[in-house]
Structures are given as C-alpha cells and as structure tokens.
Amino acid sequence: MPELPEVEVVKRSLTYKIKNLIIKEVKINDDRLRYRIDKNKIRKIIGLKLEKIKRRSKFLLFFFNKNIVMLVHLGMTGKFFFIDKKNTKFKTSFYYNINNEKDKKHNHVIFFLNKKQKLIYNDVRKFGFIKFFKKKNLYDNLH
C-alpha cells in the first residue's frame, strides 16, 4: 500500500503537471475497482477545470470548478501516469517503473485533457477507488 510520503509525492507531481487543465473526455476501461466508478458522476467533470489537488491522509482530492471533488485512494497498487502533448509518459512516483505493455491492461480510467495530454489511473490489484462529491459534502465522507 502506498505510504503517506508516496501519496504526497504523487500529489506534488500531479499538481505540477495537470493544475488548471480541463477534462475533455473520460474513458473507463474497467469500472470494477474497490467500489464501482459512478459513470454518471464521472461524466460531470467533462469540461471542468482542475483547480487544485490536495492530500488528506492517504486520499488524493482533485478540486474542480463547479464545486466538484474527485476523491482517489490508491489502494495497494494504484498509480497515475501522465502523458504530455509529445506523447511522453511520466510516472508520478519513484516506487514503480514504466512498462507500457504490462501497464496497458491495468489502465482503468483515462482522463483526456486539453493540450492533447492524458492522465491515466492504473491499478493492478483494483483495491483503489475513485469517488465524486460536492465540495460541501466532502469532509462528511472521509473516514
């Protein structure tokens, strides 16, 4: 399971790469994580700008305009990859390596961003999760 310092590293690397970018499209390859991804809620972030990323305990909190928050827990093996406009793939933590063939089958959610960039949620064991909340209800749902 990613320890707290690793989650902080992921937050910092993602903040640097995706802050102020807009979600153009979301592709769900497999919604069967620890909790199923709510497809109706994930569609609501399309067209929204990512304003900031925070960490609370081992949760990553992605704050979008329109007061929507995407809460992510990496579980045991969850990770993010960032692909820039030159199609260069970056990892967001130092605990794993990039292996395009091996990684591809575990890319569960792909967020297509403006400027032809992508954010990929990858989780081999599927113990992580992605949930959505209104900003005002967020802290009632953290446990």
Predicted regions and their residues:
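Phosphate/anion-contacting hairpin/loop surfaces
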Residues: 70-143
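A glycine-biased structural micro-motif
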Residues: 19-23, 43-51
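Structured interface patches
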Residues: 31-40
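Generic beta-strand structural signal
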Residues: 55, 63-64
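A short, Trp-centered hydrophobic/proline-enriched beta-strand micro-motif
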Residues: 18-32
